[in-house]
Amino acid sequence: DYGAVAIINIFISIADIFLSSGLNTSLIQKKDADDLDFSTIFYLNFGLSVVLYLIMFITAPLIAHAYNLPILKSAIRVFAVRLPVSAFQVVQVAYISKKMQFKKFFFATIGGTLLSAVIGITMALKGFGVWALIGQYLTNTVVDTMILWATVKWIPKKMFSFKAATPLIKYSWKVMMTDLLGTLCNNLGSFIIGTKYNSANLAYYTKGKQLPLLFRDNIYTTLISVLFPGISVVNDDITAVKTITRKSMRIMSYIVFPISLGLMAAGKTIVEILFTAKWLPMLPYVYIMCVETIISVPATIALQPIKAVGRSDLMLKTEIIKKISFVILTVVAMNFGIFAIALTIPVNTLLDLIVNAIINKKIINYNLVEELSDCFTALVLSFIMAIVVAFIGETELTICIKAAIQIVSGVLCYTGISWMTKNKEFSYILNVAMKCLKKCNEFN
């Protein structure tokens, strides 16, 4: 069942790029975007989502035949409904990002995640199999969309302009193609494994990727949704852009690094608790993706100023070069097995890091050495914490007690060293948390 969902997700994630990547990004990047711009992009997005759904509907039997999984025919057709539903929220997300109304985005995400988790677990316990996972994904999308429409004070107007659309499309198609190339290459390994091996191999590979990405993507979605609009506001002041980028680099690494290294140190314990011992073959892929996640922090942050200053042309040109190299690397790795295919992911991200740093050096005078130095402190603190967590993992305790001690000791070790060394990122995050608690108390 999970192998089937993994295959479905590949095709839907590719289709999602057309909706969530380019057009709404152009609204955030444009300083004086008005109602005409937002309404125009809304209708374009919805029209595109209908076309994409029809393509998925028509090609579903072909995909099912290619992977020899008959259930894919109906599953893809139902799962693809999230495309037109998503089209109703992407412009809303762009609007609240533009207005810096991030609380609304947070509550929409939390609401969808919690309710979809309940529905997914309930359906799984009732024996719905693959449909439980599809139900979870669809519920998440529908609830997110409903909450955004209920809370965001913008609705599309009865207006559309090809003149307004032209400059937005001119910028966004390059961003869209860049993200599409990235998504295709990120899923290239899954395509190959699903075709050359079997759905069980694909399930271990996909599940191993999913666990680290679950933490990373949620953090990235939150912080990047703040960072990109923030840089776009000051995109004509290079000094301000560099200052914001460096601060974001330090904060992101401070948050992501301990989670990634902690997951590596406690991986076996966590996998056994969450998925049972039969899923332990996914561990090598968990470790590989944790390494990739660490490398992705400077690579991802360094990409934001390139987008914000409007250089989507540079993004696309360099992405083509990077992905050609990645495809060649993956084709070679095919001859050495699934593990070799998985290793191409962190190697590709490392290439992204180097290329993005070269571009940033030219655009905002932020070089690779500065990027790595901004991440170094968090890496050292996280490494010390991971050693402590790994040591506890070798003790002869019951699995649940061991996991609890590993998590608590990891948090205490990381925050304790941060406090003793007067880490600036720790102080900043603590101050933000205290302000949030104060506002909550005032509200109550």
Across the structure, where does each feature detected by a protein language model lie?
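Alpha-helical transmembrane segments of multi-pass membrane transport and lipid-handling proteins
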Residues: 19, 43-68, 74-77, 118-122, ...
